[in-house]
């Protein structure tokens, strides 16, 4: 059942340039040439809110990501739905079902987190427990529905140690999955003297969610494993979806292909795909994120050694991938975690973590969280625009989301991961199991 309404804590206002201002940037191209880039910086301020805090040693919140539900009567104040999960302390990638939080007043008050049965674990057999992890929700305007996409995994019920959990690696261990939310069905009566009623809210949410479905892909060996975890995707003007899918054959490296899907408000149907992107490096390419900016499509990709980037005219067929770099030719230093996009009408932004920020003590350098403007022509990060979005408090913040909320504001959502191996040190540095909303407040409207 639901928790009480959460009142927001305003944590910090921060706009923090990391380097001296430069007149122009220099981008290193694939041919190792340098090209002068005249980038017009887009102004913004940042305010960080704490929407939830839980600092205990059994589990912590992870993967918070938001979706906007437009408000026709008041466009500047849409409803926002946020999905998130629990991770069991000390267990790698053992997550709960998907919880949901909601706000109808621009984040001043949040209802939830609620766990609806349609989004919870399910028992597949006597041997396996099914669930969906790494969820990203998004609005589909043509049908008035929210799509939530993630990865179906299977947990071993017959493990040797009943106190530890592990993912099963047989029978197609990872498959892309999605659920559908209908905001028109999600309504409840507010009890007298209360802003929200947990019981009636939970029942309304049960009506509104259509549970997890497996995303049907072509029956080819290279799609034996497939995933849309922690992935940004694009809705085209005609309602078709462009979804970057990570996939591999049994035991193979992961590749990424952007696929096109039809969505009728209830089911997604495969409609085609573009070229396959590969890298001969450990694990391959995973956790891809796609965005459209000024008529062109940009794709960022995770790899254990470095992040990669590429672009496309049609959103399906992409050019050769290249490592992320600063505009002075130096490596960006992002690896072993995801990157995501924000777009303003005048500028494209990358949100990421990286090495070299006095953060060697943080697991996989997953704090602080940075934001910087991207040169879309040269596919590099303008170093002079890099700012700290959420400071380093000692705990990793690598599993995050990035979403446009209104024409004046975009949000980056993330939780502090409080693992036992570094919990004491992280607490000394200020970590407290918080779930943050970093508000990127644009200096001019994003139209």
Could you tell me what each predicted segment is?
Residues 1-7:
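Positively charged n-region of N-terminal signal peptides that target proteins for export
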Residues 9-26:
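Bacterial N-terminal signal peptides
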Residues 28-31:
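Sec/Tat signal peptide C-region and signal peptidase I cleavage site
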Residues 33-60, 68-130, 139-227, 234-287, ...:
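Beta-rich carbohydrate-recognition and catalytic domains
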Residues 63-65, 134-136, 230-232, 287-289, ...:
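Conserved beta-strand position repeated once per blade in WD40 beta-propeller domains
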Residues 402-406:
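Short glycine/proline-rich, acidic loop/turn segments that cap or connect secondary-structure elements
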């Amino acid at each position: 059942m639901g928790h009480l309404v959460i009142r927001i804590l305003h944590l910090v206002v921060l706009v923090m340039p990391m380097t001296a201002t430069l007149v122009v940037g220099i981008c290193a191209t694939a041919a190792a040439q340098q090209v002068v880039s005249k980038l017009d910086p887009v102004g913004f301020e940042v305010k960080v809110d704490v929407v939830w805090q839980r600092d205990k040693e059994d589990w912590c919140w992870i993967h918070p990501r938001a979706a906007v539900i437009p408000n026709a009567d008041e466009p500047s104040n849409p409803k926002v739905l946020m999905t998130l999960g629990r991770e069991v302390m000390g267990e790698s990638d053992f997550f709960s079902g998907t919880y949901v939080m909601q706000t109808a007043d621009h984040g001043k008050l949040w209802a939830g987190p609620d766990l609806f049965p349609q989004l919870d674990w399910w028992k597949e057999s006597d041997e396996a427990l099914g669930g969906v992890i790494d969820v990203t929700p998004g609005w589909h305007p043509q049908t008035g529905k929210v799509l939530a996409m993630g990865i179906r995994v299977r947990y071993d019920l017959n493990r040797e140690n009943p106190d530890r959990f592990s993912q099963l690696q047989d029978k197609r261990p990872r498959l892309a999955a999605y659920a559908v939310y209908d905001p028109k069905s999600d309504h409840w009566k507010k009890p007298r003297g209360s802003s929200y009623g947990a019981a009636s809210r939970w029942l309304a949410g049960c009506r509104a969610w259509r549970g997890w479905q497996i995303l049907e892909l072509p029956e080819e060996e290279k799609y034996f494993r497939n995933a849309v975890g922690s992935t940004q995707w694009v809705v085209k003007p005609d309602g078709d979806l462009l979804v970057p899918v990570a996939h591999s054959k049994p035991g193979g490296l992961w590749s990424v292909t952007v696929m096109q899907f039809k969505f009728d408000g209830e089911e997604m149907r495969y409609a085609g795909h573009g070229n396959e992107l590969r890298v001969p490096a450990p694990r391959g390419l995973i956790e891809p994120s796609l965005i459209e900016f000024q008529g062109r499509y940009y794709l960022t990709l995770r790899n254990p050694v470095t992040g990669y980037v590429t672009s496309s005219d049609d959103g399906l067929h992409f050019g050769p991938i290249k490592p992320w770099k600063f505009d002075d030719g130096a490596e960006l230093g992002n690896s072993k975690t995801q990157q995501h996009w924000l777009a303003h009408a005048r500028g494209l932004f990358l949100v990421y973590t990286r090495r070299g920020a006095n953060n060697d003590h943080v697991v996989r350098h997953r704090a602080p969280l940075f934001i910087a403007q991207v040169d879309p022509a040269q596919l590099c990060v303008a170093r002079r625009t890099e700012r700290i979005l959420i400071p380093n408090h000692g705990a990793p913040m690598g599993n995050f989301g990035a979403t446009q909320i209104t024409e004046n504001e975009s949000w980056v959502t993330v939780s502090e991961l409080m693992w036992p191996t570094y919990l004491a040190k992280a607490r000394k540095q200020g970590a407290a199991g918080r779930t943050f909303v970093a508000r990127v407040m644009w200096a001019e409207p994003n139209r």
